[in-house]
Amino acid sequence: MALTIFPSINALLNGLTAILLLIGYYFILHGKRVLHKKIMLSAFTTSIVFLCSYLYYHAHVGSVPFKGTGIIRPIYFTILISHTILAVVIVPMAIVTLVRGLSSRFDKHRKLARLTLPVWLYVSVTGVVVYMMLYHF
């Protein structure tokens, strides 16, 4: 497989993660715990696949410079910096949230999930935005 396909695959995985997170949230809001669990495990798995793919790609390609100029440049870097910081933060948050849910510590799970979900969604969506800005503008 050519390395050039990896950024598109990574964006697809990020987008899929965001969709799965929203579906999982919908299910828990409607009391469907079993479906919520299955979908959130799928979101977590998709994120793991993304992370492996992302690391593999950048281990072989390195960093990709942003070629945009003008006002788009500071916008891009603002999004990229916030995305990068929160991408580091979300890893332990998602793991702890997952462990608490799987170990039936639902009060602690719920409390942390209220913080984890918006951060995870932001990271997933801005991952797609960064991809679009870097490769398609």
Model-found features: residue ranges?
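Alpha-helical membrane insertion/targeting regions
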Residues: 1-137
